[in-house]
């Protein structure tokens, strides 16, 4: 998605985005401990809204967006944020409906709409149960620290990982997800300002202009 990364198998880019790009794209209570005291993946919240900053190696840019994540219904909405005036930069809204297998791209200014097929299956924004625990540490300084855990898809058969996820120990909120290929970062997404729940479920409903949507993705620059 214009938000999340490729599936944890790293592949073609959820550049269907999302969270484009999208798809870099979790939340519970204290991670439970196994019989030998080894940390276990926590359960991330399934419905929340927040903001994200996503870096894509292909473009060399950071993009900011508002994010609505509904894991229960397998849908995501990403709304590009304008933080500075960039000539010929178009802002879009992306609505990804995985149960229907479609993604809508809507121009925020004109409401022009594109409808595309989602070729990748739903990949929840969370810590897979077969993940490898890497580390636990604090972010910030005295009186302002947040304890997080770092997980990856590294296995004993190989020494490196292609996915790294950082989540808070308390409430299991996503902090950052990073995808790599051959030791190079291809996609990295940071999450912040998270609020539980979906304030307005209608954000997942495409506008009426999508009833006559074109079938090709719109360009992000001025080449209309």
UniProtKB/Swiss-Prot annotation:
The keyword ATP-binding does not apply. Residues 1-37 form the signal peptide. Keywords: Disulfide bond, Glycoprotein, Lipid-binding, Lysosome, Secreted, Signal. Ubiquitous. Detected in brain, heart, skeletal muscle, kidney, testis, ovary and prostate. It holds the Pfam family Ependymin. One of its GO terms (molecular function) is calcium ion binding. Its main location: other. GO terms for biological process: cell-matrix adhesion; myofibroblast contraction. Glycans are attached at residues 130, 182. It is found in: Lysosome lumen; Secreted. N-glycosylated; the glycan contains mannose-6-phosphate moieties. One of its GO terms (cellular component) is lysosome. InterPro entries: Ependymin (IPR001299), Ependymin_CS (IPR018224). Disulfide bonds join 42-172, 88-222, 113-210. Homodimer. Belongs to the ependymin family. Binds anionic lipids and gangliosides at acidic pH. This is Mammalian ependymin-related protein 1.
């Amino acid at each position: 998605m214009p938000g999340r990364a490729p599936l944890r198998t790293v592949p073609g880019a959820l550049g269907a985005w999302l969270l484009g790009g999208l798809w870099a794209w979790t939340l519970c209570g204290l991670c439970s401990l196994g019989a030998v005291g080894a940390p276990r993946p926590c359960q991330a919240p399934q419905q929340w809204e927040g903001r994200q900053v996503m870096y894509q190696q292909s473009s060399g840019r950071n993009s900011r967006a508002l994010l609505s994540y509904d894991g229960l219904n397998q849908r995501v909405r990403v709304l590009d944020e304008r933080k500075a005036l960039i000539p010929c930069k178009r802002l879009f809204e992306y609505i990804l409906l995985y149960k229907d297998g479609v993604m809508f791209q809507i121009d925020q200014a004109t409401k022009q709409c594109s409808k595309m097929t989602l070729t990748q299956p739903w990949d929840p924004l969370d810590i897979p149960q077969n993940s490898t625990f890497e580390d636990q540490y604090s972010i910030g300084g005295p009186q302002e620290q947040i304890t997080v855990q770092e997980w990856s898809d590294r296995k004993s058969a190989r020494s490196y990982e292609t996915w790294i996820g950082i989540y808070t120990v308390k409430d299991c909120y996503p902090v950052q997800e990073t995808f790599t290929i051959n030791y190079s970062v291809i996609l990295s997404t940071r999450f912040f300002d998270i609020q539980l729940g979906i304030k307005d479920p209608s954000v997942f409903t495409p506008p009426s202009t999508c009833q006559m949507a074109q079938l090709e993705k719109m360009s992000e620059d001025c080449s209309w």
